[in-house]
């Protein structure tokens, strides 16, 4: 399995289009622009579509996204060999741990404790080779 198969993870509020936090391995500006466009499209269509698992595929990478109530969207970019089951397991774990609720009231973004908890979880799943 490729090192660091999870390339990018974004948590955002799809009702406002605000990014709450992100986790990223090396991502170039072109890929980051692509991710932001995908998130913007998700925000336009996410209303009322809760807990629907979605996938966008390409030759080498896949995007997975899902929105939970009230309007927290997770967008994950992984290499195309990374198991879909593990992507949604990671998202469920982040959601269960209530990481999106760890908000800094001034910035309206996830606080440092939440960012560290997210980083720790992603690193576990980076190395997870369970099939």
Report the location of each language-model feature.
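Generic short beta-strand
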Residues: 9-11
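Acidic, low-complexity cytosolic segments
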Residues: 2-6, 15-131
